[in-house]
Amino acid sequence: MVTIRADEISNIIRERIEQYNREVKIVNTGTVLQVGDGIARIYGLDEVMAGELVEFEEGTIGIALNLESNNVGVVLMGDGLMIQEGSSVKATGRIAQIPVSEAYLGRVINALAKPIDGRGEIYASESRLIESPAPGIISRRSVYEPLQTGLIAIDSMIPIGRGQRELIIGDRQTGKTAVATDTILNQQGQNVICVYVAIGQKASSVAQVVNTLQERGAMEYTIVVAETADSPATLQYLAPYTGAALAEYFMFRERHTLIIYDDLSKQAQAYRQMSLLLRRPPGREAYPGDVFYLHSRLLERAAKLSSLLGEGSMTALPIVETQSGDVSAYIPTNVISITDGQIFLSADLFNAGIRPAINVGISVSRVGSAAQIKAMKQVAGKLKLELAQFAELEAFAQFASDLDKATQNQLARGQRLRELLKQSQAAPLTVEEQIMTIYTGTNGYLDSLEIGQVRKFLVELRTYVKTNKPQFQEIISSTKTFTEEAEALLKEAIQEQKERFLLQEQG
């Protein structure tokens, strides 16, 4: 029989008592009063901060947005179907943040930076706050490097610089996303990291964009953040900030980034839904009073950093959808006033077969011209003016029957210039090709061709110059100027190609 020794037992108990460390962990808790429509009202949580993450008993996370005298309004980051009235909630003491790393490149993630492409976890050692203050005045420098979109109409007349914010605005189905994805495709080999944020879109549309990027090898330098139409409003509202945090991570590491928000109208609608459910007072078009701040704090994060901070940049291309061309609605006017210019896409031009359907007359870039390369300035200087005069003449010519020869010539030139601005989707052009195309049009080399022959001739001319006059591209890319030598080479190439082309057409 085992003898029980009392002194041994008392020694063990004494040791355990001495080892006992009385740690008091204070947790700020509350109780669910009501829950529904993605909103929970909570009693308690006295010490909670605005924007703090709270955790429900069954694991759902929420953000405390409304701090009222007797309860806290929390928006849920999930469906919250298992949350019950009376269950407990605890404050986490953290503000929303996401992991960030190089490993995110080529992946499709959601607003919480969790992968949704079925390719496993993403390793990350660092994290960033989803909402962080924008760089101040001293931290920035003015925009001076071009960000080429590969679209002639934009790069020649509405140029975008690295660190600029340029709005893409237009009705539904006018090619807004196409302009944005073409810009991503054109960054291949330019050492620019792209972030595409899809907010409240159809999952099929997002899949189509991802497929296009994968086929063209553009996913290598792209991150897609997607919250589709069936996602909770909270996540649709957060997605752009998640994208911005990822782009900022690269920007502060001396890299160039491009971020596309597709589109901010849907984010504003998600925010309106949250605000109304939280019983915040509605303002114009039932949007809450701080919807301007919603977008301004997001877009101000795009910047060109100073040399002390490593000259990284973040260029933002927000997209806004208008209803039947109404640019004076609330969200469009807000975003126009925040950004450094806008590209206006018109449904009428799109339906008339002019694609990309950019309305050059009312599209502007407020800072990009400082970023244009000299060669482009030299050839594209008079393009915008000629097109504006042509549009005016065309409207007048509809009513006048007999036009003098000069007017007829100007109309013919305008039609050909409009033709050279047309481009197929996913076929961006290099700067050298754009310069060649514009020079051919503005100097009258296309005037003798039929309108239907213009695009075919230009395609063949680009191929001809690439194979027979490689020096042309070398001069432009090395000197960034349209030198006399380059002009002589181009004139020669145009003449030779024109003779070949006309012989082919006759044959």
Swiss-Prot record:
EC code(s) of this entry: 7.1.2.2
Membrane topology listed for this record: Peripheral membrane protein
PROSITE patterns cross-referenced by the UniProt entry: ATPASE_ALPHA_BETA
Binding-site residues, ATP: 170-177
Site (Required for activity) residue list: 363
Keywords: ATP synthesis, ATP-binding, CF(1), Chloroplast, Hydrogen ion transport, Ion transport, Membrane, Nucleotide-binding, Plastid, Thylakoid, Translocase, Transport
Main location: plastid
InterPro entries per record: ATP_synth_asu-like_sf, ATP_synth_asu_C, ATP_synth_asu_C_sf, ATP_synth_F1_a_nt-bd_dom, ATP_synth_F1_asu, ATPase_a/bsu_AS, ATPase_F1/V1/A1_a/bsu_N, ATPase_F1/V1/A1_a/bsu_N_sf
Gene Ontology molecular-function annotations: ADP binding; ATP binding; proton-transporting ATP synthase activity, rotational mechanism
Keyword Heme: no
Cellular component annotations (GO), alphabetically ordered: chloroplast thylakoid membrane; proton-transporting ATP synthase complex
Subcellular location: Plastid, Chloroplast thylakoid membrane
Domain of life: Eukaryota
Catalytic activity: ATP + H2O + 4 H(+)(in) = ADP + phosphate + 5 H(+)(out)
Primary role: Produces ATP from ADP in the presence of a proton gradient across the membrane. The alpha chain is a regulatory subunit.
Quaternary structure, from the entry: F-type ATPases have 2 components, CF(1) - the catalytic core - and CF(0) - the membrane proton channel. CF(1) has five subunits: alpha(3), beta(3), gamma(1), delta(1), epsilon(1). CF(0) has four main subunits: a, b, b' and c.
Family matches, as PANTHER family: ATP SYNTHASE SUBUNIT ALPHA, MITOCHONDRIAL (PTHR48082:SF2)
NCBIfam families: atpA, PRK13343.1
Family per similarity comment: Belongs to the ATPase alpha/beta chains family.
Protein name from the UniProt record: ATP synthase subunit alpha, chloroplastic
Organism: Eucalyptus globulus subsp. globulus
Taxonomic classification: Eukaryota, Viridiplantae, Streptophyta, Embryophyta, Tracheophyta
